[in-house]
Amino acid sequence: MSSVEGMAQSIRSGTEPVRVQWLGRIDYQAAWDLQRELAEERIAGGPDSLLLLEHPEVYTAGRRTLAHERPVDGTPVIDTDRGGKITWHGPGQLVGYPIIGLAEPLDVVNFVRRLEESLISVCASFGVQTGRVEGRSGVWVAGDGGRPDRKIAAIGIRVARATTLHGFAINCDCDLGAFGSIVPCGIADAGVTSLTAELGRTVGVAEVIDRVSEAVLDALDGRIALGVASSPGVDSAQ
């Protein structure tokens, strides 16, 4: 697990408050279309946005996804332009899409690390100790008692014209069995977990939303110290 750096400056180019929207459960394609609309608005001088939502069940593949990592049962997959590999979205998983104009000089890896740090702090607020794993993006519960490292939150983004799209997903009380048909995030030697699985009680999306929103905004604006680790899962098209 990572050591900690000091506080950072805001990574946003703008100073206006981030517009936070809770969309409820929304189709993946509809949310993707909305992201692109908001990104164009941001590029034209509009506000930063943070979309929080759930998706109906869907598999999405990042640009680095390999053929053998896709569902073995032929389940449809939406191919996306984000970084990272294949993952699952569905009910019980809180998804966040920050549409943010990044400050110069662009530091995309630092942006990803801020998202990771925000989710680490959210997990800690529930009493779940998490951190980073060197060379692997996302947020992890360390292996214990014969169990492997377990991913509790995934991150995959794209940056185009200094503006971010896609984002993160944290498992609250989702069906972890849905990950069984794929190699989640291309990592075959690790597991997947959720807040509910780690705590032994139901932790629904509604209980997590406000904590995630606050932590992400704090991390983007430098109010949360950053740990030290590399962060793959980035696709940059400046």
Curated annotation (Swiss-Prot):
BPL/LPL catalytic domain mapped to chain residues: 44-224
Catalytic center residues: C185
Annotated catalysed reactions: octanoyl-[ACP] + L-lysyl-[protein] = N(6)-octanoyl-L-lysyl-[protein] + holo-[ACP] + H(+)
Positions of the record's site feature: Lowers pKa of active site Cys: K151
NCBIfam families according to UniProt: lipB, PRK14345.1
Protein name: Octanoyltransferase
GO cellular component, one term: cytoplasm
Positions of substrate binding: R82, G83, G84, K85, I86, T87, W88, H89, A154, I155, G156, G167, F168, A169
HAMAP family given in the database record: LipB
Organism per entry: Mycolicibacterium gilvum (strain PYR-GCK) (Mycobacterium gilvum (strain PYR-GCK))
Localization: Cytoplasm
PROSITE patterns: BPL_LPL_CATALYTIC, LIPB
Role description: Catalyzes the transfer of endogenously produced octanoic acid from octanoyl-acyl-carrier-protein onto the lipoyl domains of lipoate-dependent enzymes. Lipoyl-ACP can also act as a substrate although octanoyl-ACP is likely to be the physiological substrate.
Record key words, sorted: Acyltransferase, Cytoplasm, Transferase
GO biological process, alphabetically ordered: protein modification process
Gene Ontology molecular-function annotations: lipoyl(octanoyl) transferase activity
Broad class of where this protein is predominantly found: cytoplasm
Additional notes on this entry: In the reaction, the free carboxyl group of octanoic acid is attached via an amide linkage to the epsilon-amino group of a specific lysine residue of lipoyl domains of lipoate-dependent enzymes.
Residue stretches spanning the membrane: none
Family statement drawn from the similarity comment of this UniProt entry: Belongs to the LipB family.
SUPFAM superfamilies per the UniProt record, alphabetical: Class II aaRS and biotin synthetases
Pathway(s) annotated for this protein in UniProt: Protein modification; protein lipoylation via endogenous pathway; protein N(6)-(lipoyl)lysine from octanoyl-[acyl-carrier-protein]: step 1/2
Gene3D superfamilies found in the cross-reference section: Bira Bifunctional Protein, Domain 2
Pfam families xrefs: LplA-B_cat
